[in-house]
Amino acid sequence: MKKIGLLTSGGDCPGLNACIRAVVRTANYYNIEVVAFKRGFKGLIENDFTTLDYKSVAGILQKGGTILLTAREPRFKDYNFRKIAYENIQKHNIEALFVIGGNGSFQGAYLLQKDFGLNIIGIPKTIDNDIYGTDYAIGFDTAVNNAMEAIDKIKDTTMSHERIFIVEVMGRDNGFIALEVGIAVGAELTLIPEYPFPLHVIEETILKAKEMGKNFAIIVLAEGVASAKELSEILNERLKDKDVGEIRYQVLGYIQRGGSPSAYDRVMASKFGVFAVEKFVQGEKNFMVAYENGKLLTKPLEISFNKVRIPNLEEYQINNILSM
């Protein structure tokens, strides 16, 4: 019987369990055994594994997080520890390692491919949706919905008390979540790192809203732009004589990464998992599953971390048109 390895690595996100389920059940369908390593690359180094089958993944489709657990493993940067990981993989007679991860995870997995010739198959996941080479990564849709639902509640209070609220969403290096959420909640202003706004433009936008008779405003801020706390303090000081009221802030944080995956994430995670295993069965090696122009395809793993994906300028323009 053929064997494949499976792990989840990096930050968790909704849809991981749906993908695990799809990989395992598709593998079992083709009479392939799945050896799953716990806590990502840490599990490879420590040979901490379990065998998954059709029954063991029952009832996990709708659950957030990952049943395999996940962790960041700095030791994996060291060749000697990667060699230990590879030797553990060899003990199980694994023909390919399936890695459900993001940019960093794929970069680590690629080192196993480069150092030892291991067949690596990547399945993209990250709420940031910033993996180059694919239009979609597992977890993004749920994260956007989580943020939208939270901001809708904040907006009720914002309108009732006639306030301005800066809401910080995840997106350390990119603004994909902020852009989608900004449109979904009708934000007066959306700030992302790719297209920075000068401080005076932010001030002018707030004052313009006031002139238009708006007594409330939602500003969606990607965390990579600035701290919501610091930005609110700066704006409160600079606008204290402008009669715009107190500017408050809220950091949404990890609420965006948790919870039951949306229908879209469940379906996409399932499709990604099935597609990855079927391509392995067909003999393809060393690839990343990608979703492009509505179709699933394979791409070289290294493309995911050699380039940077940035938001579509058209979507950014939509935000600007609809704001205010």
Swiss-Prot record:
The gene is pfkA. One of its GO terms (molecular function) is identical protein binding. Substrate binds at T126, I127, D128, R163, M170, G171, R172, E223, R248, Y254, I255, Q256, R257. The active site is at D128. This is ATP-dependent 6-phosphofructokinase. It catalyses: beta-D-fructose 6-phosphate + ATP = beta-D-fructose 1,6-bisphosphate + ADP + H(+). It is found in: Cytoplasm. Its main location: cytoplasm. ADP binds at R21, A22, V23, V24, R25, K155, G186, A187, E188, K214, N215, F216. It comes from the Bacteria. GO terms for biological process: canonical glycolysis; fructose 1,6-bisphosphate metabolic process; fructose 6-phosphate metabolic process. It is an enzyme of class 2 (transferase). Its EC number is 2.7.1.11.
